[in-house]
C-alpha cells in the first residue's frame, strides 16, 4: 500500500535511514529510560517500535498525529537529564491534542538530526496534503493494521478481521463476493489497487447518487445550469451560484474533459460534498473576517485558567507545556500564579497544593517564544502575584528582559486613553493584567468605601450561603494584594470585607504570611488591565474606569446573571470581565462557558487540559476568524445602554426555525479499538447551546451494528430565539441499553458560521482532533419565524 503516496512523498537520505531503523532511548522520567528500536514504515506515514531490531514491532505513532518536533533544550525532562545524556542527542515529538510528548535520546548527534529533520519533512508534507492524499494515507494505515503478517497483501481472513476493525457488519458470502471481484490477479489476496477497489465497493453512497440523479437530466452528469440550480435551490448560495459553480467544477471534477465542458460527474459531485466547500462550516468564516479595530472589551477572548497545570488542581504536574499548548491552540489570556521560590527565583504553581513547581523565567521564555505562532493578536498575562517585594523585582526583570519589545509597558500614544485599544492596535504585544498602585485622584470617598465594604460583605455571605463548602484557596476573595502604605492610604475597611466570613461549623484557613506589598516596578507594567475588586454594578459605574477589570468566580457570575443580567451585559459593554472555575473543581473540570458569553463576559477562563463538552463549546466559538483568539461580540452585547437580559431575552430578536435532516454516516470509528469484534450502534444527537430558552437537544434512533455507513434519514426541528448567541454541537454516540451511550465523535460551530443545504460534518475526537474520514451527512434549512407564529 505504500504505492498510494509514491511519487508524492518526499524522499531523502534522512528518510531512507529512518526506514532502516534506529536504536534510541525512550524517556518518560529520570528513572524510566528504555532502549527501543524505532523504524519508519515503508508507507512513510507510520513509525513502529520494538524492543530490539528484528523483534516483534507494534505501532508507535502516525505522522499525521505529530504536531511538531522540538530540539533537546526545549524539553524540561531532557534538560533535567543533561548530565546523563548530551542534550544534542535528544529531541521531543509533540502530538496534536492532549497526548503526552515522546522524548527520545539517540546514540549520536547525527542520528538525532536525522530523525528530527526527517520527521519535520514528513510533518510538513502531511500538513499540506490534499483531500485525496489524506484518503490514501487513511487507507494505507488501515491496510497496515489489517495485514497481520505484514507480507504486503491481504487474505480473505485478514479482510474479514479488517472489516470488524472498520465497524463493518457484513454477510460473509457477500464480503467474499466483493473480495473475489476486487482480486483481479486471482491470487487469492488483495494488494495495491485491488484493495482500493475493494474499499470503493464498500463505500457506495446511494443517498448521494439519488440526490445527483434528482438534478441530472441523464443521470450521468450535472450540466453547468443543473449544478447552478442545485447550488441555488438546496445550498442557498444565491446570486453567486453561477460563478461558484464554475469554480467548484474546476476544483472537484476529476476528468479534464469534464472541466472543459463545464460538467460535473458523480465522482466530482461527491468530491464537492465531502470537501471544505461542502462542509457545514462556512469557508468564509475560516479566515480573519471580523472587524478587529474595536476596543478589547467588545470581543470574546480565548482564555485559560491555571494554564501551568497539565493535570488536576491538587497533585497535578505544572509544566511550561501547558502554556505552549494553550498558546498554540489560539488562547490569548493565560494565567500565571507566582510565588516566592528558592534561591531568589520566583516559581509558578498552584499555591497551597502538592502540584509541582516550575521557574517563572521558564514560563516567560515559553510565552515569548510561542505567543504569536498561531495568532499575532495580543496576549494577556493574568498575573496572580503572591511574591515578596524582592522577588517581584525579579518578576519585572524577567518580563522586561525576556519579552523585550513584545511587552507593552506604556500607553500606545503616550497619552491617557479614552477607551481600551483594539486587537489591531495591539498586534504582537503582551499585556500584563494585575494589581496596580492607586493614584491620588483614584481614591474613594469614605462613604463610597463604606458602601463598597457593605456590598462586598453581602456578596460574600450570599456566596457562603449558596456554597458553604467552597473554601478553596483559589477563591478571589482570599488572594488580594495590599497596596504600599507609603503611596496610598490604608485599605483596612476593604481588607476586613475581603476576608472569609466565619460561620458556625466552617473551618477557617490556616494562618498565612502577611500579604506582600506591591512593587512599584511591577505595578508600572500594568497599563490597560488594572485588576480591581468587584462590589456592585453601581459601584463600578461610579468609581471604576474602562481600563479596570474584575474577576468573578463561576458561582458569583451565575448569581449576577440571574439577579441582574441586563446590568452585567451593560457592565461588559465598557469594561473587561474574567470568569474563572470554582475552587471545588479540583479535578480540573470545566463549567459551561455559554452562559457567561450570553452576558458578554469576555475572558471566560477554561481548564484547557480537560477535554469534554465544555471545551468543545470553547473550541467551537473560537474556530472562526482565523482561530485568532478574538471573536467580536454581537452588537447588543457591545451597547452600554443595552436592555438585553440573557435569562429573559425579548424582541427585537428575529427567531429562527432550524430543520436538520440527519441522513447518513461514514466510516465512524470504534469506541474501543481493543474490542475487535464489537461494532457500534450509532445515533446522532444535535445539541443547541445559547440563551436558556434556546438550550435543548434532540437525537435520532440508533442504527444497529453499522458504524461504516449507517443511514438514519430522520428530521429534527428546533426554534431558536437568539441565533446570534447559539452554538450547535453534533454528537455521535454508540447506543448501549445497559449503560451510558459511549462517545464516538463531535463537531461544534457557531450558528453564524453554519451553511445551509446538503452538508458533511467532519467529526472530531474528544481532544478536538480530526477523525478523518469519519463524517455525518445532513441537510440544513433555516427559516425566519413569522410574527404571527411568534404571537
From Swiss-Prot:
Catalytic activity, reaction form: a 1,2-diacyl-sn-glycero-3-phospho-(1D-myo-inositol-4,5-bisphosphate) + H2O = 1D-myo-inositol 1,4,5-trisphosphate + a 1,2-diacyl-sn-glycerol + H(+); a 1,2-diacyl-sn-glycero-3-phospho-(1D-myo-inositol) + H2O = 1D-myo-inositol 1-phosphate + a 1,2-diacyl-sn-glycerol + H(+)
Alphabetical list of SUPFAM superfamilies matching this protein: C2 domain (Calcium/lipid-binding domain, CaLB), EF-hand, PH domain-like, PLC-like phosphodiesterases
Co-factor requirement: Ca(2+)
Domain PI-PLC X-box: 290-435
CDD domains with a match to the protein in the record: C2_PLC_like (cd00275), PH_PLC_delta (cd13363)
Record's keyword annotation contains Cell inner membrane: no
Active site feature: 305, 350
Record's cofactor remark: Binds 5 Ca(2+) ions per subunit. Two of the Ca(2+) ions are bound to the C2 domain.
Amino acids binding Ca(2+) 4: 679, 681, 705
PANTHER family, per database record: 1-PHOSPHATIDYLINOSITOL 4,5-BISPHOSPHATE PHOSPHODIESTERASE DELTA-4, PHOSPHOINOSITIDE-SPECIFIC PHOSPHOLIPASE C FAMILY PROTEIN
Protein name from the UniProt record: 1-phosphatidylinositol 4,5-bisphosphate phosphodiesterase delta-4
Gene behind the chain: PLCD4
Amino acid at each position: 500500500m505504500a504505492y498510494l503516496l509514491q511519487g508524492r512523498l518526499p524522499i531523502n537520505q534522512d528518510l531512507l535511514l529512518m526506514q532502516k531503523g534506529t536504536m534510541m532511548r525512550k524517556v518518560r522520567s529520570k528513572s524510566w529510560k528504555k532502549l527501543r528500536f524505532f523504524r519508519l514504515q515503508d508507507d512513510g506515514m507510520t513509525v513502529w517500535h520494538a524492543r530490539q531490531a528484528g523483534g516483534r514491532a507494534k505501532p508507535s505513532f502516525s505522522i499525521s498525529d505529530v504536531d511538531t518536533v522540538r530540539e533537546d533544550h526545549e524539553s524540561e525532562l531532557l534538560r533535567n537529564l543533561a548530565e546523563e545524556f548530551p542534550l544534542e542527542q535528544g529531541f521531543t515529538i509533540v502530538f496534536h491534542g492532549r497526548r503526552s510528548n515522546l522524548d527520545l535520546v539517540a546514540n549520536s548527534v547525527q542520528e538525532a538530526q536525522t530523525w528530527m529533520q526527517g520527521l519535520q519533512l514528513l510533518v510538513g508534507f502531511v500538513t499540506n496534503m490534499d483531500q485525496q492524499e489524506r484518503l490514501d494515507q487513511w487507507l494505507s494505515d488501515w491496510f497496515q493494521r489489517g495485514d497481520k503478517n505484514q507480507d504486503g497483501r491481504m487474505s480473505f481472513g485478514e479482510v474479514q478481521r479488517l472489516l470488524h476493525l472498520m465497524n463493518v457488519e457484513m454477510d460473509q458470502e457477500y464480503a467474499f463476493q466483493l473480495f473475489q471481484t476486487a482480486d483481479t490477479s486471482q491470487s487469492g489476496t488483495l494488494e495495491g489497487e485491488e484493495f482500493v477497489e475493494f474499499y470503493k465497493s464498500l463505500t457506495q453512497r446511494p443517498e448521494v447518487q439519488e440526490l445527483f440523479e434528482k438534478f441530472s437530466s441523464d443521470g450521468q452528469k450535472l450540466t453547468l445550469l443543473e449544478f447552478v440550480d442545485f447550488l441555488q435551490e438546496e445550498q442557498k448560495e444565491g446570486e453567486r451560484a453561477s460563478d461558484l459553480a464554475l469554480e467548484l467544477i474546476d476544483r472537484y471534477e476529476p476528468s479534464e474533459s469534464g472541466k472543459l465542458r463545464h460538467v460535473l460527474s458523480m465522482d466530482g459531485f461527491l468530491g464537492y460534498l465531502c470537501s471544505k466547500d461542502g462542509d457545514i462550516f462556512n469557508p468564509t468564516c475560516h479566515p480573519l473576517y471580523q472587524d478587529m479595530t474595536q476596543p478589547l472589551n467588545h470581543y470574546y477572548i480565548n482564555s485559560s485558567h491555571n494554564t501551568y497545570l497539565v493535570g488536576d488542581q491538587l497533585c497535578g504536574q505544572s509544566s511550561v507545556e501547558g502554556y505552549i499548548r494553550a498558546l498554540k491552540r489560539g488562547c490569548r489570556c493565560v494565567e500565571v500564579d507566582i510565588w516566592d521560590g528558592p534561591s531568589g527565583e520566583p516559581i509558578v504553581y498552584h499555591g497551597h497544593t502538592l502540584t509541582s513547581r516550575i521557574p517563572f523565567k521558564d514560563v516567560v521564555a515559553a510565552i515569548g517564544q510561542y505567543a504569536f505562532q498561531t495568532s499575532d493578536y495580543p496576549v494577556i498575562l493574568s498575573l496572580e502575584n503572591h511574591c515578596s517585594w524582592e522577588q517581584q523585582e525579579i518578576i519585572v526583570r524577567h518580563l522586561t528582559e525576556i519579552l523585550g519589545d513584545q511587552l507593552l509597558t506604556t500607553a500606545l500614544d503616550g497619552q491617557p486613553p479614552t477607551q481600551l485599544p483594539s486587537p489591531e492596535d495591539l498586534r504582537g504585544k503582551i499585556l500584563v493584567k494585575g494589581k496596580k498602585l492607586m493614584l491620588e485622584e483614584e481614591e474613594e470617598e469614605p462613604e463610597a468605601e463604606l458602601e463598597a465594604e457593605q456590598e462586598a460583605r453581602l456578596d460574600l455571605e450570599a456566596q457562603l450561603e449558596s456554597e458553604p463548602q467552597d473554601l478553596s484557596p483559589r477563591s478571589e476573595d482570599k488572594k488580594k494584594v495590599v497596596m504600599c502604605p507609603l503611596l496610598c492610604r490604608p485599605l483596612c475597611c476593604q481588607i476586613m470585607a475581603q476576608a472569609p466570613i466565619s460561620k458556625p461549623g466552617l473551618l477557617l484557613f490556616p494562618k498565612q504570611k502577611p500579604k506582600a506589598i506591591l512593587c512599584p516596578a511591577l505595578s508600572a507594567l500594568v497599563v490597560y488591565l488594572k485588576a480591581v475588586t468587584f462590589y456592585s454594578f453601581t459601584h463600578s459605574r461610579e468609581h471604576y474606569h474602562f481600563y479596570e477589570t474584575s474577576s468573578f468566580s463561576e458561582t458569583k457570575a451565575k448569581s449576577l446573571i440571574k439577579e441582574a443580567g441586563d446590568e452585567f451585559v451593560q457592565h461588559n459593554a465598557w469594561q473587561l470581565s474574567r470568569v474563572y472555575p470554582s475552587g471545588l473543581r479540583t479535578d480540573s473540570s470545566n463549567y459551561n462557558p455559554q452562559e457567561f458569553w450570553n452576558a458578554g463576559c469576555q475572558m471566560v477562563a477554561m481548564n484547557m487540559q480537560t477535554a469534554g463538552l465544555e471545551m468543545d463549546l470553547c473550541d467551537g466559538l473560537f474556530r472562526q476568524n482565523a482561530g485568532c483568539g478574538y471573536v467580536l461580540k454581537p452588537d447588543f452585547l457591545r451597547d452600554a445602554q443595552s436592555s438585553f437580559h440573557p435569562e429573559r431575552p425579548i424582541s427585537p430578536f428575529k427567531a429562527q426555525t432550524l430543520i436538520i435532516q440527519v441522513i447518513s454516516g461514514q466510516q465512524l470509528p470504534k469506541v474501543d479499538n481493543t474490542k475487535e469484534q464489537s461494532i457500534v450502534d450509532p445515533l446522532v444527537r444535535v445539541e443547541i447551546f445559547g440563551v436558556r430558552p434556546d438550550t435543548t437537544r434532540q437525537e435520532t434512533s440508533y442504527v444497529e451494528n453499522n458504524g461504516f455507513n449507517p443511514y438514519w434519514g430522520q428530521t429534527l426541528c428546533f426554534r431558536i430565539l437568539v441565533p446570534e448567541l447559539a452554538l450547535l454541537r453534533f454528537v455521535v454516540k454508540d447506543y448501549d441499553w445497559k449503560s451510558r451511550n459511549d462517545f464516538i465523535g463531535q463537531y461544534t460551530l457557531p450558528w453564524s458560521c453554519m451553511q445551509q443545504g446538503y452538508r458533511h460534518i467532519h467529526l472530531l475526537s474528544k481532544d478536538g482532533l480530526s477523525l478523518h474520514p469519519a463524517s455525518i451527512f445532513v441537510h440544513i434549512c433555516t427559516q425566519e419565524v413569522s410574527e404571527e407564529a411568534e404571537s
